[in-house]
């Protein structure tokens, strides 16, 4: 099934259909997953991996032939023709990637910037066939080019939340620092005013307050 000319958010049925066509799962496994209760907000690969279905592509003599999230990530990335990338949070310039777009925009578009250089932005996604966001991305990254990579839904959910929380914490700390600096400046101005031997009439009440302090 070719979906490269369409923009779609893949769901559980789409993934199961493709896995069945690719002979990764059988009809029994398909029926088990599709008829079970599930969290519809969860990424379909996470849901499928929880069932531990036999992997039809695993070698016959393999000790572990279960369908894992790691294998499913490789399968979907290959189907989309995207490189599979694993985030190393220590190598990500968090302020740089989060300033490109809001958390809510990144969440709704199923994306996360993970690298920013002088001329390029690397954008990760766990929905490789959803491309609606590409129509507006040039407005966000300005003159830079971009390339898209596939991220595990487990990683993108975790680090999207953590990166933006870090940015909010930094912004909050900077705000507190600026307020403290402003308070110090105001106090210094008052003290200097208190030393003025010929204050303006409008400032005399402030001088009295400073002298009282």
Describe every region a protein language model picked out.
Residues 1-213:
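N-terminal, intrinsically disordered, highly charged
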């Amino acid at each position: 099934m070719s979906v490269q000319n369409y923009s779609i958010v893949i769901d559980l049925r789409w993934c199961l259909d493709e896995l069945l066509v690719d002979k990764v799962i059988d009809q029994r496994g398909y029926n088990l997953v599709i008829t079970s209760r599930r969290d519809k907000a969860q990424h379909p690969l996470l849901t499928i991996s929880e069932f531990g279905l036999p992997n039809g592509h695993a070698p016959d003599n393999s000790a572990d032939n279960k369908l894992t999230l790691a294998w499913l990530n490789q399968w979907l990335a290959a189907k989309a023709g995207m490189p599979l990338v694993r985030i190393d949070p220590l190598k990500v310039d968090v302020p740089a990637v989060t300033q490109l777009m809001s958390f809510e925009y990144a969440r709704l578009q199923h994306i996360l910037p993970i690298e920013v250089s002088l001329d390029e932005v690397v954008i990760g996604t766990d929905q490789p066939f959803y491309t609606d966001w590409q129509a507006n991305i040039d407005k966000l990254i300005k003159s830079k080019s971009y390339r898209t990579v596939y991220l595990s839904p487990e990683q993108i959910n975790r680090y999207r939340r953590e990166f933006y929380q870090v940015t909010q914490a930094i912004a909050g700390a900077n705000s507190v620092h600026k307020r403290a600096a402003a308070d110090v400046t105001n106090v210094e101005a008052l003290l200097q005013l208190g030393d003025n031997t010929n204050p303006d009439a409008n400032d005399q009440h402030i001088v009295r307050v400073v002298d009282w302090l």
